[in-house]
């Protein structure tokens, strides 16, 4: 059997022992070794050899064999052409790529196998069809150009028609965080090592060197982009940045087998305007995962796919640009007046994904039903614009001016396309009657054929006197006159036998044959005419590409902000303020997910962090008391403020925060051989090395997984570091000894979460109170968890014995415990250690004592 090794060498080796069709297949397959080849044969796409085995497993289809070639059976699997989209979608969603090989030659004129060639490559990030895409998520292709230990990164949201350039990255960890934040469907790179390691756990491939040639990059930029845009890009960016941009354009050109004309904009992401959150913190804070308790699932109630995707972009890149935030807040307030957003959301709910529809037009993958959806969506725009004009603010007017009322296009589509068109243009039936006179005439020939056949049949019955004569049609033999064999003696000479059946004969006459030729010819001509009209229509639609893209972007923006206005009222959110006083003052803060999922009222808490008072809170109290919730809700509030949403607090005055770091939870990294403690220390080291005075740091119980003294020592050292750097830090701990730091550092304060005991039960107050906790309540929490009574009684006795022996509660011992071994010995200690008391004289001792006193 042939193997992948054979594919690699197919061109170089003798393949003459195979059938001509398999020879053709192997030559094509050798050019697409790492992806599945869908090879068109009649009404099926067939896969052979290892591709067939893989497809059978992935798609749960039958693996068969197609005869023999080179003396061996050929594994084969196939899917129907008309149903291929659903199968391709399954493969693409698994992160795999496909080459579509179509029959491009004419079977009637071909000598040997019909000519075939790959007309399209489908990869996870380069799809535009609705079946392949998540409506609420961008389809992201990332390109990474590694050079001199630096990473140049660009990405495109394929159907959005834009390429974004990211700042140059200098570490693998920074690269990993940036890529995972984008959550791409596919990654390309010039680095084979990076592709092999794949730290992103996403589909990644290393491309040939020419894709990352600066010369080729500039060529593709010039060929793919509008002249003015291309010239601007070439003058604006450095060579390595241009190489990265060009790699995306060259890759798309190769995939599409055409120039990616739908790319109309290149922009640079300014990091200094962004609130940075690494991937671990995103996971810890449950910002945008797929769970029902994620912040995105609670905040994201947009009415359009356009808005849902834009909201995800807001979540990926929260902005610190106060002008942008002020604009969003102004619009939210305007739309919230008299709940005006409700009328807007009602209109938005009728608008389809016009951004992706117009991209499909540009990419040649649009379907007739897409054009109907486009028309219906554009019909909503006058209503939407009128509603927006009722709120005559500069901010809303600016958005409204970018929504284009495309009445001419609506009229064109309404006249051209029937209301419920077929899935494809392949068999016609898409263009509305009355749109094209020539097409109507060609269709009328077929439509009027029934009347002709009725009259023709009646005339033949009268002519030969046989009432059972029938005129019919089948796809194989065409039109015919059918007579029983018992009437063979009455057959006119002009009847020519066409088909013999068991009890009857079928005939054709010259008149019927001429009619058949006319009808079949009209069908072919009508189909050709309809396809020509359809192609011409698409060319007309694409003239509105930029206007529709701009309209789509504006609809997305108003959808997100109407959603924010609705959420503000529904969830009782308030508008945050921003200050330049290095102060974070929050009142009655709530955790939205927990509030949403509990029956009893949520207990809010205040938080105050300030450079003038305290920047670090040591948070103590029992498990389940509310420490983690308190810290998370502060971080989530800051995040919401920086995406432009209102926030879950009665009052929020926020200073400039550039990064949110969190160290929460405990888990092993088994695949990398790292223990829970090692994972914790690695993440802590990352935070310590990167945090600044503008950071918000969440640290939850640092120092677990090692000995008590080691853990306490590390926790204290970390807390001191954060206190010294002035980062706003919420530091939860069960090491009560850390509460002593408030006496040593003026910017450290203690808060704790209270619990009340009644008999043997514990009741959590979930309220943050100034000062340190006095107990941990671990045994009481264990009781709530269901630990058996005998174990609890034993634990109580153990606790009593330990507390009795424990001397660390004395303040002097606490201080002693904090005295970690110094890195250098005290000079006085060195002098004393050097004295030999067995040989020193009393006079020498007095002199030494005098010297020490002078020091």
From Swiss-Prot:
Give any single GO term for biological process.
Answer: mismatch repair
| Keyword Nucleotide-binding attributed | yes
Q: Where does ATP bind?
A: 621-628
Mind telling me which GO cellular component terms the entry cites?
cytosol
Keyword Oxidoreductase found: no
Write out the transmembrane intervals.
Answer: none
One family name in Pfam for this protein: MutS_II
Q: Which GO terms describe its molecular function?
A: ATP binding; ATP-dependent DNA damage sensor activity; damaged DNA binding; mismatched DNA binding
Source taxon at top rank? Bacteria
- Recite the UniProt keywords alphabetically: ATP-binding, DNA damage, DNA repair, DNA-binding, Nucleotide-binding
Q: Which family does it belong to?
A: Belongs to the DNA mismatch repair MutS family.
Query: What is the role of this chain?
Result: This protein is involved in the repair of mismatches in DNA. It is possible that it carries out the mismatch recognition step. This protein has a weak ATPase activity.
What is the recorded name of this protein?
A: DNA mismatch repair protein MutS
Q: Which organism is it from?
A: Francisella tularensis subsp. holarctica (strain OSU18)
What gene name does this entry carry?
mutS
